[in-house]
Amino acid sequence: MSGKIQHKAVVPAPSRIPLTLSEIEDLRRKGFNQTEIAELYGVTRQAVSWHKKTYGGRLTTRQIVQQNWPWDTRKPHDKSKAFQRLRDHGEYMRVGSFRTMSEDKKKRLLSWWKMLRDDDLVLEFDPSIEPYEGMAGGGFRYVPRGIEDDDLLIRVNEHTNLTAEGELLWSWPDDIEELLSEP
């Protein structure tokens, strides 16, 4: 090597169209999801989400459920079936029907509701709960329903932040008996 410094040619990044809230909303109405919008604009899905939150865009059902999530859960907790079913329950309550769910997701949610009802249980979160068989990621356990649980599917404890909308999201659907009696 001669000792001379080699300079690499710097190729400017291709310019991209600025992402705006109106463009995001327009594409959502046309059926694009956030991942597809991100790919179109060369940004991350999180950037699309950030634009929507920052500039007052319409939130997706999942985002509303996340906004009202009753606990400060971390990455390993989302591996838990209990976490996933409660998230599905929140989406059902927000939409008011199964129309946005696959048949498989609907079946799993109905089965979960039936287990909670038949065994008279609620879901409790405590970050100190270690993972155990059937509860990957830890943090969750099923506990017997108490009078203090009222109509909620969750146990309110020192780790719970229950918003007014969350109180509606994390309660039984009004027509739960009818839903569970469907074949």
UniProtKB/Swiss-Prot annotation:
DNA bind region: 34-53
Entry annotated with the keyword Acyltransferase: no
GO terms assigned for molecular function: DNA binding
Record keywords, A-Z: DNA-binding, Transcription, Transcription regulation
Superkingdom as given in the UniProt entry: Viruses
UniProt entry tagged with the keyword Transcription regulation: yes
Protein's job: Confers immunity to L5 superinfection, required for maintenance of the lysogenic state. Binds to multiple asymmetric DNA sites. Regulates transcription initiation at an early lytic promoter, Pleft, but also affects downstream gene expression at 'stoperator' sites in the phage genome.
Protein name: Repressor-like immunity protein
